[in-house]
Amino acid sequence: FILPQFILALTYNWGCFIGWAALGSNIPFSSIFILYLSLIFWTLAYDTIDATQDEKEDKNLNLYSSTLLFGSKKVIFLNIMIITKYCFIIFYGSSLDFGFIFNILVLTISIINLIDLNIIWKNKPENASSYFSRNNYYGISLLFSIIIGSHFNV
């Protein structure tokens, strides 16, 4: 089985389409699709980090997780995924005319997230669980950024 984190990301985040359809929202589908892409990169990144705790088991089970696939280049790929996630989130906000305040908030969250990845997590499996848990804070921060961006188009 190759890249279970990618399969998880594709299926887990499908809920943004379901929520969009259920609410009959005025948000264009193209904006929701941009959000979906950001969520795929987000899930792929945090679940790759979480999978570092299980590398030995994944090898024994012949489960080709993203952490094994990326190998020694894992941190580079994680940085790329996290930066890509935030780029898509900024594109999402731009597609809805959220403005400067939203961009500043998202850039601030992205810098904190990258510091967390590169200075706190540091590619150590024993730090993976706490990094994984901190994604809740990134999520709530992004939610507030979206709420602020949608109400203050400055």
List each model region and its residues.
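Multi-pass alpha-helical membrane architecture of UbiA-family
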Residues: 1-154
